[in-house]
């Protein structure tokens, strides 16, 4: 069997649920969050601790639909939490600002593309490595 065949045979498309999970705070409540992230987190049994969106009414509606108790009024209020995973579901034009405000030593999930340009993507990567 070739190396490539061995690699393909051993690829996994499913992974075990972690034994210890962290609450998730979602920044941005657009279609991908409503249609994919929240249903997936619910199915996996992951706790969504809160939502933030510049359109608070949209975040409030989604929180009610998914029984999420906290809707934050600002990035800063959401980012005051440190023992969680941040799901940044933002348009590329807003990602750099959010990443700059992230607390240090946390985990974050990013949507693609990672910035509007290669330079902006590299800037975001550098900020992440510093934090």
Residue ranges and their predicted role:
Residues 12-14, 34, 41, 49, ...:
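Generic detector of bulky aromatic hydrophobic side chains
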Residues 66, 70-127:
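Beta-loop-alpha module in the N-terminal Rossmann-like domain of NAD(P)-dependent dehydrogenases
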Residues 2-66:
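N-terminal Rossmann-like dinucleotide-binding module
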Residues 1-2, 130:
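Polar low-complexity intrinsically disordered regions
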Residues 22, 46-47, 69-70, 106, ...:
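A structural micro-motif
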